Amino acid sequence: MNGNCYKRIVIKLGTSLLTGGTGKLDHERMADLCRQIADLTRLGTEVIIVSSGAIAAGRAKMGLRHIPKDVPFKQVLAAIGQSQLMNYYDQLFSPHGLTVAQGLLTKSDLSDRSGYLNARNTLLALMELGVITIVNENDVVAVDEIQQAKFGDNDNLSAMVANLIEADLLLILTNIRGLYTADPTLHPDARLITEVKEITEELEKLAAGSSNKLGTGGMVTKLEAARLATSSGVNVIIADGHIPDIILKLASGETEGTRFMPSLHKPDSRQRWMMSGLCTRGNICIDDGAVKAIRENQKSLLAAGVQQSEGKFGRGDIVKLSDSRGKRLGYGITNYSSDDVSKIKGLHTDEINTVLAGNQGPEIIHRNNLVVI
């Protein structure tokens, strides 16, 4: 473990790792992880932590045996536990001479461009001061997070943060070694996949078949997070947080867990904001021909390739693109409103004028305003 290979790292610590499956925070485990992070900062690495555990801390504080299922009471536990969680981190980092800061985010905070940039500037300023920021979703107001909605888990939040600050590495620490060729609890001969260059449908099926729930997420959400982060030019590693000095080993370039290779194309700030998917107003479903033209040939989206639109959006809004099976392809700024897209979907370019009195050009979304995930 000589030096480190990364200047800026986001480390996601999940509930299963922090509690050891007991439902209570494992202070010894947390102390060891914080010690590794402190050692990393002394090597000049900037670190942000995305930490679960607020509800577990609140449950322990209130002496509850079981976690209630109703959302309002989970929010109460999150409110109680968040201060406890921050206090633990403060106690663990203080002996190393490090100050901690709390960063509570919601989807709405980052959904507009100014909020995205403000959050980015704050996190960068904290890193410049040498402060360890502990990020979590604001469970008290973000109902989607506790109900495990699509973008409401800390795997995806960690990818958002990595996207936001242009991290070099997103390290997702959990209680298994990484992604396997089969569920290792059912197939003893399952092999660890050490490197992933592309997240394919086959990999997604492997993740969906995993029996390990890993807190509120699971391997499916970890693949979603890896897709967003790697598309943003960030290296991603999923690894077992129980391995001795795992953070220091991975930061120095040692091989552990499953590594997801980043896209060769480094998106700019505007493209990264679009990639976050937080500002979308609707969805445009496109056919396989359009998917191929966009993904393989870097073409614009034309009306002929559109199958349907969902949601209400206007010209200039950001929309999600998905294929005929509902799989996300990317995001783009639309030249047409949802009403107009419904009118011209499937039409060839020379037919648009017969439907719309004044059209906005042949492209529904121009290639320059489109990012592929």
Curated annotation (Swiss-Prot):
Residue ranges annotated for the PUA domain, each copy included: 281-359
GO terms, molecular function: ATP binding; glutamate 5-kinase activity; RNA binding
Gene name for this UniProt entry: proB
Superkingdom per UniProt: Bacteria
NCBIfam families with a match to the protein in the record: proB (TIGR01027)
Binding site for substrate: 52, 139, 154
UniProt-recorded name of the protein: Glutamate 5-kinase
Function of the protein: Catalyzes the transfer of a phosphate group to glutamate to form L-glutamate 5-phosphate.
Record's keyword terms, sorted: Amino-acid biosynthesis, ATP-binding, Cytoplasm, Kinase, Nucleotide-binding, Proline biosynthesis, Transferase
